[in-house]
């Protein structure tokens, strides 16, 4: 007799874990550059769609088809008897639940190898992960294999899912090599900021939400007081560890970099979730607190280590989130387990080193197996299909070359142009931010004016001038109002990109100084004849002035001829209804 409550709960968990694919897709897309967004979305879609039939083909059988020490059994298309699992839910419900876990392990790899991986190669190694790599590791820990018989404990996958995916992510990123431009000739890292942290943050929120199904659903039961109590503890510990890790990462980066790092803090949330996954059923809330605390610091130090010392280019921090904290979470069971649901209590709860030793042994053996198998697979792929795309493809972006997609954002702006600005510092501050109090020298420094040289040989002053104004987009409304007040009613406005470099600009991304960044600006062009050029220039300078170098620049050109298409009027007459 199946339990309807347990069946529904397991299905809800499976559906939530499936929706993690959306979270991973948004997170990875936001942490990478816009020219590769379509490729990121395609990979996150296809690793699940490829993994599902592969896991059905032989993966589930290898994982749960028997109680052998090393593998379950060879059972193509799941035709065998699985009564030894002792399920009180339908087998197909359990298969769905395990399938989405398998897909999660495969999708972790996408982030660390982003922006330079051959799409065909990605499809092949995603299939390999779902066919043999994840199922065999999963059998050792969950399917009755040798680690499970020794008392190895991994409730929902810090080791089986995140550590396995993280090890593959680390190996793949190392074998691929860094993205073009990531390191200079001396090996110093350059920051390559993600193009949309809004999408990245939404992805993290989705993942956090779905993690209640990932961990909570792993109980497979809500039919007794004991299982309901355990599931409640699992969900509470999951949330607590993630929240603590997020706070710790924010504070740690604030102290370390001078400002709280947004992308690192988002990684901190995921680090806490990964770390608590192994022991969420067996640690107390105090244990969850300390697990999250360590995870929040570990993820920052790990990102810095792989970025600056190991020189492994991981665009989204997948290695630090999933590998480093998967390892930490698995070890933490041996430290903080209260003895509930584990063979031995943790070291800090009087259980000695027994559980800790088992956890360490399991990690070493699982990681060794994964590295050996995936190294062979990556090498075969590299020699046949090619693991990495050519340099010109990487530079142009994978979207256009791999998928024929000009832009994943066709018709939409992808920058928050209203807030983007160079950070003021001691080298740019002019000492006065009130335009009414600013001196002429300060005004000229903030908004320089460049006039076309007067040429006398064959060129005369027509009395008509083009004034071209380059300014921050956020200042457009003030500039437009100032020009309208002068009587200028016709203007051409163009959105452009530009930058200025001032020594000492304190921009950092994930602890690495950011190089020159193109920022959204506007170019406003007006043609004047009746209105004084000097009046236009002064009005523009007052509208744009903030007290810092880089407020804008004004160019003044002599105009030799103007023709109005509608009436045929020329020069001065052609301008009278647009001023």
Where are these regions (language model features)?
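Positively charged, small/polar-rich N-terminal and surface patches that mediate targeting and assembly
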Residues: 401-405, 420-579
């Amino acid at each position: 007799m199946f339990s309807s409550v347990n069946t529904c709960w397991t299905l809800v968990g499976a559906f939530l874990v499936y929706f993690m694919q959306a979270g991973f897709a948004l997170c990875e897309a936001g942490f990478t550059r816009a020219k590769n967004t379509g490729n990121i979305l395609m990979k996150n879609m296809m690793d699940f769609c490829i993994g599902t039939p592969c896991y059905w083909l032989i993966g589930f059988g290898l994982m749960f088809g028997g109680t052998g020490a090393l593998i379950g059994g060879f059972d193509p298309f799941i035709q065998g008897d699985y009564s030894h699992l002792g399920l009180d839910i339908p087998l197909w419900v359990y298969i769905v639940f395990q399938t989405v876990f398998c897909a999660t392990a495969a999708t972790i790899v996408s982030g660390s190898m982003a922006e330079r991986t051959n799409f065909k190669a990605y499809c092949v190694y995603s299939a390999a992960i779902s066919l043999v790599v994840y199922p065999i590791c999963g059998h050792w820990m969950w399917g009755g294999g040798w680690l499970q018989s020794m008392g190895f404990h991994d409730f929902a996958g810090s080791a089986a899912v995140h550590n396995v995916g993280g090890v593959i992510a680390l190996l793949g990123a190392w074998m691929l090599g860094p993205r073009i431009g990531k390191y200079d000739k001396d090996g110093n890292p350059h920051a390559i900021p993600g193009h949309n942290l809004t999408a990245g943050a939404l992805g993290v929120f989705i993942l956090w939400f779905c993690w209640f199904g990932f961990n909570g659903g792993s109980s497979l039961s809500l039919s007794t007081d004991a299982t309901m109590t355990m599931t409640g503890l699992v969900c509470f510990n999951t949330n607590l560890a993630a929240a603590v890790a997020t706070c710790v990462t924010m504070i740690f980066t604030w102290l370390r970099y001078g400002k709280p790092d947004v992308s690192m803090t988002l990684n901190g949330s995921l680090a806490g979730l990964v770390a608590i996954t192994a022991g969420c059923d067996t640690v107390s809330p105090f244990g969850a607190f300390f697990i999250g605390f360590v995870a929040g610091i570990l993820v920052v130090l790990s990102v810095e280590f792989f970025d600056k010392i190991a020189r492994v280019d991981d665009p989204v921090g997948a290695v630090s989130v999933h590998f480093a904290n998967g390892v930490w979470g698995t070890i933490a069971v041996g430290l903080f387990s209260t003895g509930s649901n584990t063979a031995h209590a943790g070291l800090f709860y009087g259980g000695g080193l027994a559980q800790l030793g088992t956890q360490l042994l399991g990690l070493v053996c699982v990681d060794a197996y994964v590295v050996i198998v995936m190294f062979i697979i990556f090498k075969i792929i590299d020699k046949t299909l090619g693991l990495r795309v050519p340099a010109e493809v990487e530079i142009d972006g994978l979207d256009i070359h791999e998928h024929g997609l000009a832009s994943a954002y066709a018709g939409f702006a992808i920058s928050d142009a209203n807030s983007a600005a160079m950070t003021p510092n001691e080298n740019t501050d002019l000492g006065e931010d009130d335009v009414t109090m600013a001196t002429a020298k300060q005004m000229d420094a903030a908004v320089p004016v460049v006039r076309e040289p007067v040429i006398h040989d064959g060129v005369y002053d027509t009395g008509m001038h083009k004034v071209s104004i380059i300014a921050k987009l956020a200042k457009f409304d003030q500039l437009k109002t100032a020009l309208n007040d002068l009587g200028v009613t016709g203007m051409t406005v163009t959105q452009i990109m530009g930058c200025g470099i001032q020594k000492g600009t304190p921009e950092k991304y994930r602890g690495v100084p950011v190089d020159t960044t193109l920022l959204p600006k506007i170019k406003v062009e007006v043609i004047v004849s009746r209105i004084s050029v000097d009046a236009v220039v002064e009005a523009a300078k007052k509208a744009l002035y903030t007290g810092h170098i880089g407020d804008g620049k004004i160019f003044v050109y002599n105009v030799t001829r103007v023709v109005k298409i509608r009436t045929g009027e020329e020069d001065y007459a052609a301008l009278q209804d647009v001023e």
